[in-house]
């Protein structure tokens, strides 16, 4: 049997065929043709987005050809002599290639997600179909029917197929032309921000077979993939024109999803989303998030690559590691003979699936390409559609009923997840104020999605100012009293983004419930490591404002973090974050005293001297913590380090790790220890304030 390529990974309207072998037998070739014909006929029950009549007629001819090939196979198998006719073989091989291409074309025109794009390419589709049908009929007419004892009926069937192909040529269909004209007219309206006729849009959607929210999601995903592919195709000089068209179509289908189909369906989009999440959960069941973290940066890898030892790292992290003069594997310490990096495609796909399932947005899943969601639309039509959508959704938030409001906040959450353009449109449309009001909703669905929308809008500059000006109080209330765990975590993340502005960081800190609320997440048993890290990230953001330092200490941060570290049940990423926060607190004398009084120095030394398999970031922040304790604790703290024989060896190990190992801090600690040993003086009063002396150990 001849195996052909599947459609996976194939660009639309490309036909990568496999030529039958020169030595293939006629019977084997006929078997493959019959199987291909059967595969093609399965498309009879599917919806064609374009050239519907032409495809139906073509499938009728394939049905007739299937009868012909089955009859030829029977005749040859029943023949007592070996059958070999070069003309027959050549004819069937050409038909086989034509069938492969036809199958690909059928896949494209019935593909979920590609309906709108294929309809806009209806002229090109009809050209391909015309060429293929003529090629198949020409090859069939060259078949030496005299060499096979066929019945009169079969010979007449062959003549019929050939005559039909010659007489009835494939032409662009009127309905397709009308639909394309309608779309172009609507795109022109979008440019001028004019609301199109919904009835006209519904006629287009009916024509191509898009009737559900989930259908629109598939279309958007496909168009995004095509935009990415066009950008990467450097050979195309006119690629920008195609990107502009695809961007316009994405704007159109987003408009349909939010405004047209949103009115028709009740919760179809929610069910579709939940079903998708369930499938994704099934696919990544048993996955440990730690497996997706770069061993160097302890962050989820955006561009995973494999080095010579077989270990996987994030490209940017391992590149900097090598750039610092290190030619060893960070995990094993093995000296490498090559620093070549190989893409880990499997891990990248798992990371994408994990991020999609958990709503995680990375800066870029691959540094070599931009996500289509994270760029400004590349057409005026798409920009106009985005502004109309934002205006509509904001109006729904203000004037809609409960279900309309729910659909609007859910759509805003999706629209703003990664698109800075959509965030800008919604902020300008005035969506922040009604979203903040909806945080008080008794409907937990509305509250959760409104909070997720606020989180996304907090990444926008103007969004920050509006949220900080109107909603800090309600954000802190949600942080402490949100109906769902996810809602409280969204609030913590929003506070982190707001804390990047100094004035907002001060205002957050002045709220007496903000920092304690974040620390409750860090110490809470109901929260996983990922949630605790999100809360710590917000705390670190607040610590950038010096006025918040004492507030974090007052919230019990030091004992909470030390207890977490002592538990030994947290991930390397959370360990590194705890140490980083303690190091920041220890920059001030009060923080140093708090850490030392609770045995933090001893614990830090223990972590530093632990197994060499500890993540590099853990050791880096551990060194930073010890250094700050020494700077504020004086010679008493340094003296403790001198007494521990393992400290120097651990520091030299960190020093050898280069930039990521905190080499400058390790070098400073080594220098302090050497100076202490060289002086060999008596007891020296520590730098801690009188009356506040604490034992370093």
Curated annotation (Swiss-Prot):
| Main location, first listed in the record | membrane
**Where in or outside the cell?**
Endomembrane system
Q: Where is this region: U-box N-terminal domain (UND) required for EXO70B1 binding and crucial for the negative regulation of ABA-dependent stomatal movement?
A: 23-210
Q: Which GO terms describe its molecular function?
A: ubiquitin protein ligase activity; ubiquitin-protein transferase activity
- SUPFAM superfamilies hit by this protein: ARM repeat (SSF48371), RING/U-box (SSF57850)
What Enzyme Commission number(s) apply to this enzyme?
2.3.2.27
Domain U-box residue range list = 287-361
Q: What are the GO BP annotations of this UniProt entry? A: abscisic acid-activated signaling pathway; protein ubiquitination; regulation of abscisic acid-activated signaling pathway; regulation of seed germination; regulation of stomatal movement
Q: Does the keyword rRNA-binding apply?
A: no
Q: Which reaction does it catalyse?
A: S-ubiquitinyl-[E2 ubiquitin-conjugating enzyme]-L-cysteine + [acceptor protein]-L-lysine = [E2 ubiquitin-conjugating enzyme]-L-cysteine + N(6)-ubiquitinyl-[acceptor protein]-L-lysine
Q: In which pathway does it act?
A: Protein modification; protein ubiquitination
Q: Where are the ARM repeats?
A: 420-459, 461-500, 502-544, 546-587, 589-631, 657-696
Q: What class of enzyme is it?
A: transferase
Keywords of the record: Abscisic acid signaling pathway, Membrane, Repeat, Transferase, Ubl conjugation pathway
Name one cellular component (GO) term: membrane
What does the UniProt record say this protein does? Answer: Functions as an E3 ubiquitin ligase. Mediates EXO70B1 ubiquitination. Involved in the regulation of abscisic acid (ABA)-mediated stomatal movements.
Q: Which PANTHER family does this UniProt record tie to the protein?
A: U BOX DOMAIN-CONTAINING, U-BOX DOMAIN-CONTAINING PROTEIN 18
Q: What's written under domain?
A: The U-box N-terminal domain (UND) confers binding specificity and subsequent ubiquitination.
Complex and partners: Interacts with EXO70B1 via its U-box N-terminal domain (UND).
Descriptive protein name: U-box domain-containing protein 18
Q: What is the lineage of its organism?
A: Eukaryota, Viridiplantae, Streptophyta, Embryophyta, Tracheophyta
